[in-house]
């Protein structure tokens, strides 16, 4: 079970929305695709990740530090102990080699983008929706189709006001 390629691409957000601080009109973000040698329904499993708007693409961090570390890692450094799937915890350790401890905004954005793609790979290999996989791995296996959300109020499109939200 191997990661055979990791690609990063800059994608423009192309949105005219803005809030009190940020206009998204010229912003972009990084999208990552992790391709594995695992086949599901005859196709290689590919996991995708991206980061939230409000930050610019983090290409240099991804392509110069984190992606090369994963590509250089031994298979056992990336897989769970059973060897049946990838391990997000082990991949995180590989990514964070030689990194100063603590949170750093741009670095956490890059790591989170890869982390999302890793979880996508894992759930596709398991043939389970991610929420089901997480409920089984970290909980009692029970899950609900309802979640709490945070509605930010503040992403306004030109010409719209609070009443139109």
What residue ranges belong to the model's regions?
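Residue-level detector of flexible, active-site-proximal loop/helix-junction positions
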Residues: 10-13, 137, 156
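Short coil/turn motifs at beta-sheet boundaries
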Residues: 25-27, 109, 142
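Broad gene-expression machinery/nucleic-acid interaction feature
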Residues: 29-31, 113, 146-148
